[in-house]
């Protein structure tokens, strides 16, 4: 569950990225992550635990330093015991930005879930620290995490597997590699099971920057598919058997690109910046 924001403070940015973000000639997503983490004063901790590729963390360390971050530390967790180590907790306390790499989201949540590190990351985000993640590192940011599922575009009972995430937000359900891996159906199904939450489907090289004001801003070369169940009038997901299609009425779907926004408080999507750029 998200930590409470102390009076007089603002929550930090939450930045899920759809994976395969540009790390070479157009680093605008990672550059903006550094910017909202403090720009040239950014103090970033990279957590590559979801990945089994040892060079993953060092690659992001190199990029964030090149983008002007003042300090970058790679911090891997191999055991749950690591999550209680005072030195690691102190380093997370010092960070102004925390970044999760891609890999396997279940590896990450089963190591970190319920630990002092997970609790501290929620507390730090509630006190203004930006937290981002790419691919599997994006999925784990929310409370209701998509752990797997089937390809396709329809709502089908039992077609998605859900597990507890890190719980920085309970207002969204996040999926990644969205268009590239045909994941509309599993996001729709996840939202059908959890109609309190808004679904965010992130194409590759595309991010949703969720601000302290709960406005989603899109950055990157692809699209964000946003599934809003706030006006659903009927759902049969609770009565159909696994493998069978379900009915939902009143579901709203928005396709957002860079410059478009969605306000979670008002449930209003906007393309004002896009229309102004054409004038």
What do these predicted regions represent?
Residues 1-40, 46, 51-59, 64-67, ...:
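C-terminal and late-domain segments of enzyme folds
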Residues 15, 45-47, 73-74, 99-100, ...:
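Structural recognition of the beta-strand scaffold that forms the well-ordered cores
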Residues 49, 74-82:
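Short beta->alpha junction loops
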Residues 76, 102, 125, 170-178:
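Short, structured patches in soluble enzyme cores that scaffold and shape functional sites
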Residues 83-97:
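N-terminal small/polar loop signature for handling phosphorylated ligands or for N-terminal nucleophile
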Residues 91-94, 114-128:
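Catalytic-core regions built around general acid/base machinery
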Residues 100-102, 121-145:
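Catalytic nucleophile loop
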Residues 105-115:
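Glycine/threonine-rich flexible loop motifs
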């Amino acid at each position: 569950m998200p930590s409470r924001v102390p009076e007089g403070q603002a929550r930090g940015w939450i930045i899920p990225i759809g994976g395969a973000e540009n790390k070479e000639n157009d680093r605008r997503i990672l550059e903006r992550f550094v910017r909202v983490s403090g720009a040239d004063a950014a103090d970033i901790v990279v957590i590559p635990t979801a990945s089994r590729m040892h060079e993953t963390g060092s690659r992001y360390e190199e990029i964030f330093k090149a983008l002007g971050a003042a300090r970058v530390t790679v911090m891997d967790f191999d055991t749950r015991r690591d999550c209680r180590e005072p030195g690691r907790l102190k380093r997370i306390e010092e960070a102004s930005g925390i970044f999760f790499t891609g890999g396997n989201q279940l590896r990450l949540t089963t190591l970190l879930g319920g630990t002092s590190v997970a609790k501290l990351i929620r507390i730090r985000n509630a006190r203004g620290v930006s937290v981002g993640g790419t691919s599997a590192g994006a999925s784990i940011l929310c409370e209701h995490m998509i752990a797997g599922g089937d390809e396709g575009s329809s709502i089908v009972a039992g077609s998605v597997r859900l597990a507890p995430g890190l719980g920085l937000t309970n207002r969204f359900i996040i999926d990644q590699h969205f268009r590239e891996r045909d994941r509309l159906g599993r996001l729709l199904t996840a939202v059908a099971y959890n109609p309190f939450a808004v679904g965010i489907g992130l194409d590759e090289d595309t991010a949703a920057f969720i601000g302290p004001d709960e406005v989603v801003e899109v950055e990157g070369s692809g699209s964000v598919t946003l599934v809003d169940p706030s006006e659903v009038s009927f759902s049969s997901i609770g009565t159909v058997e696994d493998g069978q299609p379900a009915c939902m009425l009143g579901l709203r779907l928005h396709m957002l690109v860079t410059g478009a926004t969605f306000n979670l408080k008002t449930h209003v999507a906007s393309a004002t910046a896009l229309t102004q750029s054409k004038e």
